[in-house]
């Protein structure tokens, strides 16, 4: 597996309804209702002696030049190779996210009775924040809109979270005599991130199981922590912390999937695609 996992053979098109093996045969019909100022992709077909060429609309690609949906690259769907040749930044961003999430979630789970979360500020500002933000910008340079949006956004989340616990920003001081207002404010803050993350998880429903699980369970974690701040229930906070630890390990799993290759590891990650949902969704 290379840093940017590529499709080979027919692995990207195992569903016979999605791709016919006969040369030049159209797979999907033109959509007469989709007419925009720019040409929309309305057909996919193969060509060549061994069906080595794939046409997406009027664009021609070698089959081996297309990337499959893969959590190790934060690529949620079939995509052509990027123009810019950089290393895969997704494992770096995922690692920063995973470590910071793990530390904060252990606090939320009340591991060892810890109640003061300030130790996470360093991770949040630098590894989970700055490093993840840089990785997201790198993803944008690689033409991965989803990866760039996800990593830059969560890098910003960790920077903003760290700022809450830095006295210079004066955020906690503003709520010194109004703890209920602070709980409600943090509840709305986390609720917004839950809604955003649910939106991202919808965009991973045609990818792999671990890729989808990362974003869906993260959204549930945000939702639990939001409810905990609204209600003040420690049990809900601990539930969010336990689920956050699981999310951290899933993020590390996806990061490892993007790093491990046949040249550097004996243990390879084989992604498992989500079941076909062509008949369930639009």
From Swiss-Prot:
GO cellular component: fungal-type vacuole; mitochondrion; plasma membrane
One MF term in the entry's GO annotations: acetate transmembrane transporter activity
Residues covered by region (Disordered): 1-34
Residue(s) carrying Phosphoserine: 2, 7, 21-22, 28, 40
Lineage: superkingdom: Eukaryota
Keyword Acetylation: yes
Location relative to the cell: Cell membrane
Alphabetized PROSITE patterns for the sequence: GPR1_FUN34_YAAH (PS01114)
Factors inducing expression: By external ammonia.
Stored InterPro entries: AceTr, Gpr1/Fun34/SatP-like, GPR1_FUN34_YAAH
Predominant location: membrane
Transmembrane segments: 87-107, 120-140, 151-171, 185-205, 208-228, 239-259
Cytoplasmic side stretches: 108-119, 172-184, 229-238
GO biological process: ammonium transmembrane transport; monoatomic ion transport; nitrogen utilization
Modification type N-acetylserine: residues: 2
Pfam families hit by this protein: Gpr1_Fun34_YaaH (PF01184)
Keyword vocabulary terms for this entry: Acetylation, Ammonia transport, Cell membrane, Ion transport, Membrane, Phosphoprotein, Transmembrane, Transmembrane helix, Transport
Record's keyword annotation contains Acyltransferase: no
Chain's role: Transporter protein required for ammonia export. Involved in acetate resistance.
Family: Belongs to the acetate uptake transporter (AceTr) (TC 2.A.96) family.
Protein name: Ammonia transport outward protein 2
UniProt organism field: Saccharomyces cerevisiae (strain ATCC 204508 / S288c) (Baker's yeast)
């Amino acid at each position: 597996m290379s840093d940017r996992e590529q499709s080979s053979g027919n692995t990207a098109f195992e569903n016979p309804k999605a791709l016919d093996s006969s040369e030049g045969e159209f797979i999907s019909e033109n959509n007469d209702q989709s007419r925009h100022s720019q040409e929309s992709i309305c057909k996919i077909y193969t060509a060549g002696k061994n069906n080595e060429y794939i046409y997406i609309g009027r664009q021609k690609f070698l089959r081996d030049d297309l990337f499959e949906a893969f959590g190790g690259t934060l690529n949620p769907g079939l995509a052509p190779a990027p123009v810019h040749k950089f290393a895969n930044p997704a494992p770096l961003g995922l690692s920063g996210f995973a470590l910071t999430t793990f530390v904060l979630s252990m606090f939320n789970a009340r591991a060892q009775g810890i109640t003061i979360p300030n130790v996470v500020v360093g991770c949040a500002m630098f590894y989970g924040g700055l490093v993840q933000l840089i990785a997201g910008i790198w993803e944008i340079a690689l033409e991965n809109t989803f990866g760039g949006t996800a990593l830059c956004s969560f890098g910003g989340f960790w920077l903003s979270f760290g700022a809450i616990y830095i006295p210079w920003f004066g955020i906690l001081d503003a709520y010194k005599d109004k703890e209920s207002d602070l709980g409600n404010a943090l509840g709305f803050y986390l609720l917004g991130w839950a809604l955003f993350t649910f939106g991202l998880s919808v965009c991973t429903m045609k990818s792999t199981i671990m890729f989808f699980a990362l974003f869906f369970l993260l959204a549930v974690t945000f939702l639990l922590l939001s409810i905990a701040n609204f209600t003040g229930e420690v049990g809900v906070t601990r539930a969010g912390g336990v689920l956050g630890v699981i999310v951290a390990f899933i993020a590390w799993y996806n990061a490892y999937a993007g790093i491990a290759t046949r040249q550097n590891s004996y243990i390879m990650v084989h992604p498992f695609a989500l079941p076909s949902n062509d008949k369930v969704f639009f």
